[in-house]
């Protein structure tokens, strides 16, 4: 019983020691509170309108007929497209696009209206700057749709001239009517799409960095032996006492972004907020386990921080947010499972978007549990480094 009390006393002593370190170094306040708050507000306000609107495009109208002017007016009527300039030729439009004045331009050659009326298949062209992926993709969609509508309008006029009724003409032009219903994010809101992963991703990256830093700086400042003595020589009490205050702060920041996204901004959360809070707690603990593995594998502050930053940044690409994992190379599909953010993203898709029961995500919860167990692999090596390693600047 006395031995058990000694363990609790040692744990409390390590926690008090760590709390003193947290309040004495502004770096902890910045990385654990200020930086996450800034990122939450920055990303959500950056994309507060959901989709970009009124993106500037140009027009090269060499036809100069009522038909071409109607085509330009219809293009300008799209929510995401704004016709801001007209150019005499393609060269001027290309130069404007290279300067960044417009994201694309629509080219209507001379004789387009006459060829359309004579059913000689006139050709229109459009060019988009796909260096900017979102702007280029959205404008490409609008310009392509405008071209298809113009083609349909010309064909409909020809059918009317041949005596077809409106019902007959529409049945010929569109024999199958498509009724589209996007699921889970029907507004196609980029903020919903990105912020639900950016917020936990940034938090995960900061947990990596702070976990590695808080242990590595003990080695750098040669206070590691004092830290171990405070825990009566137990590496597990040392780690628990050091990281429990971190866990509490980071989980509070996780509760904050969940409340902000699902309570204040009303992002889709079809299974309720409690499963997402559990997933957030699992992500925090898994990230801390991963951080211990990083500093245990490379017990040097600069190498450990490099490992943490590299792994954290790669997580945004490998989690399947920007590019679907199922479309990756099979080797990369396997490697994606080595990133905690990947499993959090899948839990988010199942719980918040689809509203499935938690049992459907059990494999991802188990994966996060495995990340929590990673310190068992490096505990002995880390203890030896704390006792014997000499920091070389």
Residue ranges of model-derived segments:
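Membrane-spanning alpha-helical segments of multipass transporters and channels
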Residues: 64, 259-260, 268-393
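Hydrophobic alpha-helical transmembrane segments of multi-pass membrane transport proteins
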Residues: 38-41, 181-261
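Residues that define the loop-to-transmembrane-helix transition and helix capping
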Residues: 26-27, 236, 302
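Extracytoplasmic/periplasmic domains immediately adjacent to an N-terminal transmembrane anchor
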Residues: 1-190, 385, 392-393
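Residue-level signature of the transmembrane alpha-helical core
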Residues: 15, 33-37, 198, 243, ...
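Hydrophobic alpha-helical segments typical of transmembrane helices
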Residues: 67-71, 211, 223, 347
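Alpha-helical membrane-protein architecture signal
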Residues: 8, 12-16, 188, 192, ...
